[in-house]
């Protein structure tokens, strides 16, 4: 499998082949209930979710009208890419409790731009600095 996988549905979110990947989900439209870390979390249009560890994800219940994009990033690749930040533990703990983030208008615009930019960069596999570009695009 690849370091980074982009999909436009949640079909593989519970797939064992994707163990070892973190999932970054951008919900464009519709809704989905995630049962994660003993809580039920609802994603709606213009929200995003970050699933740090899939073993805590017990169930997903997408509505029929759900439109989303998912970026799966292999954890080892992500670790090589992340900046060394002493506050990262606090952020990770918060995401285990509240994986869904409701976006305001500006946040929606930025999240959409980030996902589109990442998709453009991942398609350019022949670029001399492909891995470096992917790593810097993650953050």
Language-model features: where?
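N-terminal regulatory/effector-sensing and dimerization cores
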Residues: 2-94, 127, 131
């Amino acid at each position: 499998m690849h370091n980074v996988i982009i999909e436009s549905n949640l079909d593989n979110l519970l797939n064992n082949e994707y163990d070892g990947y973190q999932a970054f989900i951008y919900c464009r439209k519709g809704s989905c209930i995630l049962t994660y870390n003993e809580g039920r979390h609802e994603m709606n249009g213009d929200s995003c979710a970050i699933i740090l560890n899939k073993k805590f994800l017990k169930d997903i219940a997408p509505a029929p009208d759900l439109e989303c994009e998912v970026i799966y990033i292999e954890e080892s690749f992500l670790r090589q890419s992340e900046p060394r930040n002493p506050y990262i533990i606090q952020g990770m703990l918060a995401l285990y409790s509240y994986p869904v983030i409701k976006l305001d208008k500006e946040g929606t615009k930025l999240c959409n731009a980030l996902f589109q930019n990442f998709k453009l960069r991942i398609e350019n596999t022949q670029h001399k600095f492909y891995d470096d570009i992917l790593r810097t695009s993650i953050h």
